[in-house]
Curated annotation (Swiss-Prot):
Keywords: Apoptosis, Cell membrane, Glycoprotein, Membrane, Nucleus, Transmembrane, Transmembrane helix, Transport
Role: Probable organic anion transporter which may serve as a transporter for some non-steroidal anti-inflammatory drugs (NSAIDs) as well as other organic anions across the luminal membranes of renal proximal tubules at the final excretion step into the urine.
Protein name, entry field: Major facilitator superfamily domain-containing protein 10
Tissues showing expression: Esxpressed in luminal membrane of renal tubules. Expressed at the surface of eosinophils (at protein level).
GO cellular component, one term: brush border membrane
Gene3D superfamilies, sorted: MFS general substrate transporter like domains
TM region positions: 25-45, 87-107, 114-136, 179-199, 203-223, 278-298, 311-328, 345-365, 366-386, 403-423, 424-444
Places the protein is found: Nucleus inner membrane; Cell membrane
InterPro entries the UniProt entry points to: MFS, MFS_dom, MFS_trans_sf, Sugar_transporter_CS
UniProt key word Transport: yes
Species of the source: Mus musculus (Mouse)
Residues bearing attached sugar chains per UniProt: 159
GO molecular function, one term: organic anion transmembrane transporter activity
Length: 456
């Protein structure tokens, strides 16, 4: 599996479903995503300090945002503490970033169905590199926000990575590929903040830019095209016309872009696809909200310092990476629905333990269950969705899924923070834990594509 014979940085021909080629594609995707996500996560431990610096500089744009944050904090009854303010401010910036991904993901997916995965991937990575360059070359809050906007619009590489995995021929490889993408996320969110904590605010954007450029060159040299010309969408106009259906959340939940395509799935498969999309949205809406409020709970109830919170998230990331690298990637094809259903149900006691914990062992047990479930759900759902649609629809379908996830991540933290401060931690975590039963029940009796194919 060495790369010595392919030293030149020339575009690769479309791959055929050969196991060695598929393994190589997955390795390239893993390393490329790891570089990209390390660039993104370096900032996380430094965000509170960065926001405080802009506040001290009395940046006018920062001041207007701060007034909005103060109004929202007052409306939900949040205490006027600097630490809470930083978490809320950073969460709102993160929600805006996710909202931009909600709009851009279906467009990149539809474009890649017509143009191929490689060129659209390179365009996305170029946009990400530009976003870090804008941030690195200016110290103003305006430049920081501009970099987040450019980065949010350009963050199509994750969606494209799932589409590339969906292009691969064998179901076991697709399942392993989705799990490996999850491992890249877990490792990056474990290692990136640790590395960022040792860097200065001035150095981080330059290191992120270095990672982004390295990622761009690496993908250009080693990623083959996985969507052959004969399997692509017949018209870019058709692709963008169907993608326009995704700007409405309701159309997105109906998978309207797939329904109006030239080769729509059978009605029962379309119903399954819509149900999976709803499960994905509800899961990430609830999960991202509770994940966001963990910082509030850890500080309010356990008086965790920033360092202790960093250790908590390191424990979560390490547990997730271990589960994804061992258990999740070995889930047999056709067994994803059962694994995801069990993991979804596990989140109910996990968040009940966290929300009602008054001792560190109880909190640790809740976090362990939470990490196990989180390691399984998204890769499993992604694998299931990747089984739907023709080769020329995979990018659009995975783009829809990423859009639904981005919408959930945009709305979840705002809603969960409001419930947390208006009703308290125990009510917030209890209600949200119970609500996980809704996606669980939606998924419980869903038939896997392999089963429906047998019936046909």
């Amino acid at each position: 599996m060495g790369w010595a014979g392919d030293a030149g940085c020339t575009p690769r021909p479309p791959i055929r479903p050969r196991p060695a080629s598929e393994r190589r594609v997955i390795i390239v995707l893993f390393l490329g995503l790891l570089l990209d996500l390390l660039a993104f996560t370096l900032l996380l431990p430094l965000l509170p300090g960065l926001l405080e610096r802009h506040g001290r500089e009395q940046d006018p744009l920062y001041g207007s945002w701060q007034r909005g944050v103060d109004w929202f904090a007052s409306a939900i009854g949040m205490p006027a503490e600097k630490r809470y303010n930083s978490v809320l401010f950073g969460g709102l910036i993160g929600s805006a970033f996710s909202l931009l991904q909600f709009f851009s993901a279906p467009l990149t997916g539809a474009a890649s169905d017509y143009l191929g995965r490689r060129p659209v991937m390179m365009l996305s990575l170029t946009g990400l590199a530009i976003s870090y360059a804008v941030w690195a070359t200016s110290r103003s809050f305006k430049a920081f926000l501009a970099s987040r906007v450019i980065g949010g619009i350009s963050k199509g590489n994750v969606n494209l990575s799932t589409a590339i995995v969906a292009d691969l021929g064998s179901p076991p490889t697709r399942s392993q590929g989705m799990a490996v993408i999850g491992v890249a996320f877990s490792l990056a969110f474990t290692l990136g903040p640790m590395l960022g904590a040792f860097l200065s605010v001035e150095m981080v954007p330059w290191i992120s830019l270095l990672f982004a450029i390295s990622d761009m060159l690496f993908i250009f040299c080693f990623l083959p095209e996985t969507l052959p010309q004969e399997k692509r969408a017949s018209s870019v106009t058709l692709g963008f016309h169907t993608a326009a259906h995704l700007l409405s959340p309701l159309a997105l939940l109906r998978f309207a872009a797939v329904t109006h395509s030239q080769d729509p799935p059978a009605e029962h498969r379309l119903r399954n696809l819509r149900r999976l999309g709803l499960v994905y949205f509800l899961y990430l809406f609830l999960f991202s909200g509770l994940e966001y409020t963990l910082s509030f709970l850890a500080h309010q109830r356990f008086q965790f310092s920033s360092l202790q919170q960093g250790k908590m998230f390191f424990f979560i990331g390490l547990t997730m990476a271990t589960i994804q690298g061992t258990y999740a990637r070995r889930i047999s094809p056709g067994k994803e629905a059962a694994a995801v259903t069990r993991a979804m149900l596990l989140l109910v006691p996990a968040f009940l333990l966290i929300g009602w914990a008054h001792s560190l062992p109880t909190l640790g047990l809740g976090l362990m269950l939470y990490s196990f479930a989180a390691a399984v759900v998204v890769p499993g759902l992604s694998t299931m969705v990747s089984s739907y649609g023709s080769p020329g629809q995979k990018g659009t379908i995975m783009g829809i899924l990423r859009s639904l996830g981005a919408l959930g991540r945009a709305l979840g933290p705002v809603v969960a923070a409001s419930v947390y401060w208006l009703t308290g931690a125990q009510v917030c975590f209890t209600v949200c834990s119970a609500l996980f039963l809704l996606p669980f029940l939606l998924l419980w009796k869903l038939k896997h594509p392999a089963e429906t194919s047998k019936e046909e």
